[in-house]
């Protein structure tokens, strides 16, 4: 909000040449510099004739959190889950994998699998593995969380995920695509937890050329949650052939020895 001829007016984000005078009704408690959502109530022949009404109040534009709320509002981001979605999600409170289903999948829990994300990431949806093969070359694994095992086509969860399309990370917060029982729980490849995944196992030669690959439904167990800063420091120290220890990010925990071996 800004002042226009002594009256409160709004200036749309990204459109500095257009201003709408605010109706007094509904503008109570709104101050200069506030972020608001507004509805155009009248379009005049001149900019000074435009009128608008406040429909949502956020707070001072001096605060990033209030600006973020306004941006999300302006893009119609869904902040809350509908009751029917939350009801379906409650079935996965503290869920663990179905052992009968696990018996029909390729068991990859014995190999060193790890994830690399930001320290703040909660919904961990992909992991990697790398092993030297006895007959030479390597097996590179890319493992994607098998969300489709839990989110069935046509369900309330499926419809909501379709509408949201992705989790949204902004500032120090996240708006998940799925309720936390799934996004942070049974569908997240958390360390030291058995999880269902789709895995692509690629056979590479010594030069990294792909010799073959296959896709499998799998059950995996991530050994460690790696973070970008930690992995970069590790790779830089290896490139410099230094023996100085690399400090792990506190949010990720200690660096797993098996992950170190995979990167050597």
Per-range role (PLM):
Residues 143-145, 203:
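Short beta-strand segments
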Residues 1-141, 148-193, 232, 239-249:
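Charge-lined substrate channels and their catalytic hotspots, especially those that engage the 3′ end
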Residues 168-264:
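Conserved catalytic alpha/beta cores of large enzymes that bind or transform nucleotide phosphates
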């Amino acid at each position: 909000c800004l002042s226009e001829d002594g009256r409160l007016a709004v200036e749309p984000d990204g459109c500095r040449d257009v201003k709408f005078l605010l109706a007094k009704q509904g503008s109570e408690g709104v101050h200069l510099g506030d972020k608001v959502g507004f509805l155009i109530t009248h379009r005049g022949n001149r900019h000074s004739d435009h009128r608008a009404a406040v429909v949502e109040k956020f707070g001072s534009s001096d605060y990033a959190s209030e600006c973020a709320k306004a941006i999300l509002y302006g893009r119609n981001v869904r902040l809350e889950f509908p009751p029917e979605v939350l009801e379906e999600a409650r079935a996965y409170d503290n869920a663990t994998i179905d052992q009968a289903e696990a018996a029909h999948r390729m068991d990859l829990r014995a190999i060193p699998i790890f994830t690399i994300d930001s320290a703040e990431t909660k919904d961990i949806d992909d992991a990697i593995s790398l092993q030297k093969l006895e007959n030479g070359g390597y097996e590179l694994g890319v493992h994607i969380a098998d969300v489709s095992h839990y989110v069935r086509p046509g369900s309330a969860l499926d419809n909501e995920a379709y509408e949201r399309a992705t989790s949204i990370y902004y500032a120090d917060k996240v708006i998940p695509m799925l309720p936390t029982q799934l996004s942070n729980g049974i569908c997240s490849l958390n360390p030291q937890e058995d999880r269902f995944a789709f895995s692509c196992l690629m056979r590479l030669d010594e030069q990294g050329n792909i010799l073959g690959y296959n896709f499998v439904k799998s059950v995996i167990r991530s050994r460690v949650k790696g973070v970008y800063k930690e992995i970069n420091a590790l790779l830089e120290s290896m490139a410099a052939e230094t023996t100085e220890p690399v400090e792990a990010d506190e949010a990720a925990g200690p660096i797993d020895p098996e992950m170190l071996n995979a990167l050597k």
